[in-house]
Amino acid sequence: MVHVWMVKTDRVLSEEEAAALTACLPPERRVRLAGQLPRQQAEVLWAYGLLLALLRERCGWREIPSMDRTDSGKPFFPGHPQVHFSISHTEGAAAAAVADAPVGVDIQRIQTPPRHLARLTGLEEPEPFFESWVRWEARAKRTGTGILYMVRHRPPLAPGEVCTAIAAFPGYAAAAAGAETVLPEQVRRLTGADLLGCLDIWA
């Protein structure tokens, strides 16, 4: 079963909160985080905080385990191959998905699409562009296929593959790809305060 959580990052992380969330990351992810810009760091921390909360509820884990990447760049838990996950972050929001089969999730703020991508997709209006883009991105994340391959070739759904549009926050588009349809009761939407409140990591 696929479970998707989304958070509206409607507040700025304090230094204490950012440090506590950083401490929850696997060591290899902390190294990558250090090389990113502050705004990108905040988006990543919200996304991984969301993943941690979801893993705690669905798997009973207290921390995010060590991660690795496939040759195509898809992240996975080498010590827990039965648990599949995906995260996504954009300006003002993040999403995480956990499932018992390969899964991909994407969330995007709806805005004017980049010109080169609008030309590539043939979609110039913001809503149609991003409603399509999150589907392509979710499918690419599920398989580890590059997003440009997905956009250029737009392959049909593979046998057993399902891609579901998810009602996100106003001004955002989201989708999840997996082995089954994501039902409304499998989706949870949180505020930043909600998420931080369910993570007891401030000791």
What is each stretch, according to the model?
Residues 1-203:
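Core catalytic alpha/beta fold that binds nucleotide/phospho-ligands
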